[in-house]
Amino acid sequence: MANIKSAAKRAQIAERNRLRNKAYRSAVRTLIKNYLNAISQYSTDPTPEKLAEVHHRLNLAFSKIDKAVKRGVLHRNTGARRKARLTRILNKTLQPAA
C-alpha cells in the first residue's frame, strides 16, 4: 500500500482505468466474434439478408474499435490492424471461388 496520498490516489485511478479498459476490450472482442459468426453463417448459406447482417456486424465492430482507439484503450496501429484483418476476411469470403 502506498504511503503517500498522491500515490494512493494514482493507484486507485489506475485500477479504475484498468477495469474500464478491460470492459472496452471485452466489448471489442465480443463484436469481433459476432462478426466472425455472421461471416461463417453467410459462407454456409449466402443470402442477401445474411450479407446485410455481415455488413451490419462489421460496422458495429469498426465503430467499437475506433472508439477504443479514441479513448486510448487500443493503440492506433492495433486498431488499424484489427480492422484490416476483418476487412480481409470479408473480401476473401465475398470473392468468388476461382
From Swiss-Prot:
Pfam families: Ribosomal_S20p. The keyword Repressor does not apply. One of its GO terms (cellular component) is cytosol. GO terms for molecular function: small ribosomal subunit rRNA binding; structural constituent of ribosome. SUPFAM superfamilies: Ribosomal protein S20. Gene3D superfamilies: Ribosomal protein S20 (1.20.58.110). Belongs to the bacterial ribosomal protein bS20 family. Binds directly to 16S ribosomal RNA. This is Small ribosomal subunit protein bS20. It comes from Thermosynechococcus vestitus (strain NIES-2133 / IAM M-273 / BP-1). The gene is rpsT.
